[in-house]
Amino acid sequence: MIRIQLNIELNYEIDQFGADFVFNIHAAHTASQQISSENLFLSQAIDPQIYTDPVNGNRYMRLRAWPGPLKVQYSATVDLTHHFSNPAQVPEVPVRNLPPEVMGYIYPSRYCQSDRLLKLANSTFGGQWQGYSRVEAIREWVQRHVTFTSNSSNTNTSAVDTLIERVGICRDFAHLMIALCRALNIPA
C-alpha cells in the first residue's frame, strides 16, 4: 500500500458579477484508492455540489462564487493498492472482448488523434507480437524518436504535433503513446 497526502490551496478574486466554477481537485473514489481522511474549506458561505462519475470515480465540485476573495483548500490522505501482473503475461484483448467500460479509450480524442496515426501504427507495430511486448515497442519507439525539451509545447500540442516536431515534454510523450495504442485498438 502507498499513502499519499494531498494539499491544495487556490485563491481567486471574483469580480462584481460572481463566477461559476467546476473543480476537479477531490481524490477519486475507486476500488484501488481509499480516502482515509479529507477536508474541504471554502472562504465564502457556499454550498457546493459534488458529483462522482460512476465509471471512473472522479469527483467534480461545482459552485457559484460571490464577488470578492475566494479561497479553496482541499486536503486528503489517500491509500493506494495496486494490482501487479507479470507484463509478459498480459494479453492483448480483441475489440470484440473488450469490457464496455474501456471502449471510450480506443477512440480518438482532441490530444490523441489515433485516427490520423493508423497507417504509422499498423506499418510500424501491426506485425509485432500482440500484448505487452507491442505496447513496450511503442514506448521504445516514442523514446527513440521524440526528444524531451522543456517548454517545447503548450496546452494545444497534440500527439500529431509531437510526431511532426519530434520534441515534447512528459505529457506529449504520453499523448503520442496513447494515440499509437488506440490506433491499434489497445485501450489507453
Q: How would you name each of these model-derived features?
A:
Residues 10, 178-181:
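Catalytic nucleophile-His microenvironment captured as a short glycine-rich beta-strand/loop
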Residues 97:
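A charged helix-plus-loop insertion that forms the helical arch/lid used to bind
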Residues 1-87, 91:
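Intrinsically disordered, low-complexity N-terminal segments that are enriched in acidic
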